[in-house]
Amino acid sequence: MKLCKKLFSFILVLSIMLSSVSAFAAPNANESGINEYNLAPGTTVICVEAFVLGWGYVLEPTVVAYNPGETLAQLTARVLAANSLACVMNGAVDDDASYIQGIGCPQLAAGASPSVPAYLMTELEAYPDWAEENLGYQPGGWNGTENGDGILSEFEYSDLGGWMYVENDVSLPVGAGAATVTDNKVYRW
């Protein structure tokens, strides 16, 4: 029995070690460079976050297939609709100049109030003039409110509030209507 337990422990430890080694193994290369996420061709990752309001994810990171030539605005609208989340666009979804004005937010629809993480509040309160000028934050509260439709939209809670995206943690110099989706990227709103 002791031998069986030792053998089982050894196999368990070995399998854990081998699985962690594969996580650090060299990523697969593809035609555009490095495929660090090991996603299938024609797929990418998209998520919508509301961490700054203390609400976590609106849409968890999701691997999705995209259509060749599809823009981030088109993909976002399609994925949000598939997840029963509203997507309010400024302009047509296929317009290069379009951008996302609002996204349906279940936390907001459920009546949640902002619960900004303490480390952010500490910074806001340490620099009140900057916070008011750049974020629309006044000590003791926000100068904006939500309009009650369950959609987190631009200018709500802050005069400068709005949806921005990053591609692999890099802000791109074009709007979502002009950003073409490509393989192996993570798009975060």
Pin down the residues of each PLM region.
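Sec-dependent N-terminal signal peptides
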Residues: 5-15
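N-terminal secretory signal peptides that target proteins for export/translocation
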Residues: 1-3
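Ubiquitin-like/PB1-type beta-grasp interaction modules and other compact soluble beta-rich domains
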Residues: 15, 19, 24-189
